[in-house]
Amino acid sequence: MGTWILFACLLGAAFSMPLPPHPGHPGYINFSYEVLTPLKWYQSMIRHPYPSYGYEPMGGWLHHQIIPVVSQQTPQNHALQPHHHIPMVPAQQPVVPQQPMMPVPGQHSMTPTQHHQPNLPLPAQQPFQPQSIQPQPHQPLQPHQPLQPMQPMQPLQPLQPLQPQPPVHPIQPLPPQPPLPPIFPMQPLPPMLPDLPLEAWPATDKTKREEVD
């Protein structure tokens, strides 16, 4: 225990003893200065690149500047497509969502697709035709059945309330108009105006009293 006590005493003496003058140093050991300042410096070294680029809005501007670069790369892809006709044929079936991305740069994307469709994807259209033919007979049967009863029900219900609604709307604004004029005279503004000058009179009375005194 004695050794621990001596160690604690030495630490206390070291922290309490003043240090030689040094520029930028308070002259004594301060926990907030000796420990926190190195941490702040270390954090500033780690986080330095982020403020150099700027805050988030600046990052958004950088992304906007990169957009034209992407548009420049798209024509390169168009130039590469004619060289890779054969590998693109099997990929056209699942890569249907890429079609909306292609017409963005210009109409040039449509011309190669039109040439590819009649030449290569003819076998791809064949499986789609029977699939599209099968759901057609099933789909019309289902909607026609519910639509027939719904069509007569929908016009009957809205027509009845629509007819009384137009006269009701003009009638509603009329009743609030007459009560508005009586509300204005009910306000206590006119009686408050004469009270204001009455409050000013006692001030003059005080001055007169002072003169009298």
From Swiss-Prot:
Supply the Pfam families for this chain: Amelogenin
Give an example GO cellular component term for this record. extracellular region
List, as start-end ranges, the regions of compositional bias called Pro residues.
Answer: 161-194
- The reply on keyword Nucleus is no
Q: Which residue positions does the secretion signal occupy? A: 1-16
PTMs per UniProt: Phosphorylated by FAM20C in vitro.
Q: Name one GO molecular function term.
A: structural constituent of tooth enamel
State where the protein is found. Secreted, Extracellular space, Extracellular matrix
Q: Which intervals carry biased composition (Low complexity)?
A: 96-105, 114-160
Where is the segment annotated Disordered?
96-213
**UniProt-listed GO biological process terms:** chondrocyte differentiation; enamel mineralization; epithelial to mesenchymal transition; osteoblast differentiation; positive regulation of collagen biosynthetic process
Write out the entry's keywords from A to Z: Biomineralization, Extracellular matrix, Phosphoprotein, Repeat, Secreted, Signal
The PTM Phosphoserine maps to: S32
**Disulfides per UniProt:** none
On subunit structure and binding partners, the annotation says: Interacts with KRT5.
Known function: Plays a role in the biomineralization of teeth. Seems to regulate the formation of crystallites during the secretory stage of tooth enamel development. Thought to play a major role in the structural organization and mineralization of developing enamel.
Q: Give the UniProt family note.
A: Belongs to the amelogenin family.
* This protein's name: Amelogenin, X isoform
Q: Which organism is it from?
A: Bos taurus
Q: What is the lineage of its organism?
A: Eukaryota, Metazoa, Chordata, Craniata, Vertebrata
Gene label: AMELX
